[in-house]
From Swiss-Prot:
Residue ranges of the TM segments: 10-30, 137-155
Residue numbers of Phosphohistidine PTMs: H233
Name of the featured protein: Sensor protein VanSB
Catalytic activity entry: ATP + protein L-histidine = ADP + protein N-phospho-L-histidine
Chief location: membrane
Lineage: Bacteria, Bacillati, Bacillota, Bacilli, Lactobacillales
Subcellular location: Cell membrane
Domain of life of the source: Bacteria
Membrane topology: Multi-pass membrane protein
Amino acid sequence: MERKGIFIKVFSYTIIVLLLLVGVTATLFAQQFVSYFRAMEAQQTVKSYQPLVELIQNSDRLDMQEVAGLFHYNNQSFEFYIEDKEGSVLYATPNADTSNSVRPDFLYVVHRDDNISIVAQSKAGVGLLYQGLTIRGIVMIAIMVVFSLLCAYIFARQMTTPIKALADSANKMANLKEVPPPLERKDELGALAHDMHSMYIRLKETIARLEDEIAREHELEETQRYFFAAASHELKTPIAAVSVLLEGMLENIGDYKDHSKYLRECIKMMDRQGKTISEILELVSLNDGRIVPIAEPLDIGRTVAELLPDFQTLAEANNQRFVTDIPAGQIVLSDPKLIQKALSNVILNAVQNTPQGGEVRIWSEPGAEKYRLSVLNMGVHIDDTALSKLFIPFYRIDQARSRKSGRSGLGLAIVQKTLDAMSLQYALENTSDGVLFWLDLPPTSTL
């Protein structure tokens, strides 16, 4: 069903009210005007016939016609007649209408007693005047009707224009289109438009946040799907290798008859498998937010010094050396266990990727409300496309070499989740001297 516009409705209601008001007003004024006109005409007529009344009162019936004729001769514009109490006409002017067809509104009894009545008729000029005034009244009513139509149109236009603009804006909002801010108004419609636009802005922000959340959820699902697929692959390969070794030993095939040798290989594989599973569980805990950082004062130099002995044997085996430059007294606020875990993985990754005879440099320097701790493995360059993927779980630049050396590919992923849990700034980037990892730590004075 086609909807009627609000303009037509407001205009119709307004014009109906105005026309009713004009009609009632015109009716009241017409009644008042007629009553006033009749009263004035009656008063004037009685006054005009007063000399005749006096003459007739002082005359007998025989002289009445002569007196009346003389009065009419002197006032030829007057039309009247005289009748007795039985209704018989005693005298009538030539143009007087004594029949009952004359409207009572145009008859005036200017005198009445026990014997006679003098009945005067309205003058023709008075009738024409009455007719002219009536026409003028009709014209005035027509003008008032036209004026009412104009006022109704202006009023309806003024009332419906902001409402239609508000409806158009609401339609655009429903379709998520751009809506400009409303014009300033000092009435309720202005307040409504402002509130609707504010609600629209908040709705857009909420939708944007929801879209971001959906995108993050989708990204998280993709990451989890990749993580579980990669984890399954990482766990399946060693298990398959151990199964082959065990079957060979059970069947006493070839070299597999040397059970002690291959059992030790199986134990090594299972140890690496256990380490990988532990790292997977740790990464899952970090990803689920079950590990809550507890910030404590931490000496950077002492923390690094306590970690380096764990990697000294590996570095010496590759003829590598550590160079540290961390001034004493650099105290930061961080979770000791989490920061040690992250630094352990960073240093291990640096040692594993530094060429034989190379150098791993570790230093810190103060900055604006922070201490920057840096780890640089000299003489190394990583392709930029691979550099951005190093924090992805199970990603390895050299798959064969990394698997042979026992690397799980989870070290930097654990570093990323750990530092993100502590809301710390960090980066891994290429420099002219090698690959640099830096980490910003807040000093104790900032918290």
